[in-house]
């Protein structure tokens, strides 16, 4: 409790209570000091409640009682749930005052200021700087622009506010390839002629926005490339450079095909006004670029065939582009004629589409009817095939019977011998099957039992796995809660004042925890020893009862015949009774000793409550009240 009292005294001093250095525990608090500390804490917790209370005890007893009742009501208003009254402040005891001060100290608001020599992280320092800047700006009153002083124009004017306008930047460091693979001219340009980043945008205010936009674009491009490489590039079994070259070649071919398709003459675009000279030049450049030997260095037979198919000679490509350009329609027809022609073609195509739809519906109906008829014919064919097979079997049997009729007697004898041999074979096979069936049945039963055991084991393991998953989920939730609680406590710890070193408190807490562990081990050892003794006592008691019962039975048989045996039986009964009384006396003695220890603890607790000193105070206050009453009565008589 000494460490707790020191923490409470330090907190009360921070709240504004004037506590002497000699006071080291709550036990040394006087009534005046208790009242002052409670009022100071109430003023910090709730100024509306504490400002109306006096922090010093008045000289009159009635005023003291009223102040004590007011303090008790104020403590209940701020949330104190324990028993409290005027006696708590005027005739206090140590446990009640300690619990009251602990409640008030917990309700005190946390201080936001920290010691300047306390180490903190970069994020914490940044947050503090931002908070201090915002607080300083909010503390400055707003003034019209014409009334602002030069010191306030920088923070209150709208000059620093700019729109987010990003411009493209040229950054050599942002390239993924190294500078060794770049030409010397490019490196010389970067080294001698490339402007700094701050000078590239047209306005200085666009520099942060441009840098942020460039960083975001590089980051998104890197993330997209990583996701594409993980999803598609790894499956291609190529190096990143080969995959990029293949992708570049595919894109060039696709663009070339799209442009070639767009450049081909169409019958529905005669008279359209457009030129294909630029398109032909672009296709020529694509054709020339695609003939390079560094695009596809490796690949399968399909890729080489594709390269051979789509790679053309430059002269042939130029001739094709010239033919396509000459085949393009002229620009004599107006736009209105073109629109009318397109509408007419559209209506004609719609009519053709409707006719084709009707024809498709008719053909579909015919196909359905033919399908149904084919199914019926197929079923009938299958039925006739089954009937023909049955008839063929019957004809075959009858033909064999007719063949046997000329020599009927010999054939009957042969059939009988064949039937007998078949029956014997059936009996033999049945006996053999019975021999094989018994071990198979046993094996089947064993496997079935094993399967059931495995199913029960698997179901048990499945339930254990489910329980384990539930425990893992609960542990994860508990870990999240503890993590959030840890962050909250960490923020509260960072906001605490660091005037007092907490290393001593930490060491003391660790010592208390160690002592508690030692006490727990000792208590566990005592409990185990007590259980062992109780088991031993129970065993000896049972053994004694059984021995006495056997001895009593043996002696009682011979007691009727021999006088000495009768006396021995009486002595045995008396000894058993005396032993029982002795055991009961020992148990009663232990109970009395335990009650004595409980009473001693209660006496120590009552002595800690300062009952005698409180009674003396009450007697003194009673005498003071009688004196005040007598003085008031004398004044009334004189008046």
Curated annotation (Swiss-Prot):
Question: Do you know which Pfam families this protein is assigned to?
Answer: CCDC22_CC (PF05667), CCDC22_N (PF21674)
Listed A to Z, the keywords are: Coiled coil, Cytoplasm, Cytoskeleton, Endosome, Protein transport, Transport, Ubl conjugation pathway
Subcellular localization(s) per the UniProt record = Endosome; Cytoplasm, Cytoskeleton, Microtubule organizing center, Centrosome
Where does this protein have coiled-coil stretches? Answer: 331-370, 459-541, 591-638
Q: Which GO terms describe its molecular function?
A: cullin family protein binding
Give a yes or no for keyword Protein biosynthesis in this entry. Answer: no
Q: Which InterPro entries match?
A: CCDC22, CCDC22_CC, CCDC22_N
User: Where are the membrane-spanning stretches?
Assistant: none
Q: Name one GO cellular component term.
A: centrosome
Q: In terms of domain of life, where is this protein from?
A: Eukaryota
GO process annotations (BP) = positive regulation of ubiquitin-dependent protein catabolic process; protein transport
Primary residence:
other
What is the annotated role of this protein in its UniProt record?
Answer: May be involved in regulation of NF-kappa-B signaling. May be involved in copper-dependent atp7a trafficking between the trans-Golgi network and vesicles in the cell periphery.
Family as reported in the entry's similarity comment? Belongs to the CCDC22 family.
Q: List the protein's name.
A: Coiled-coil domain-containing protein 22
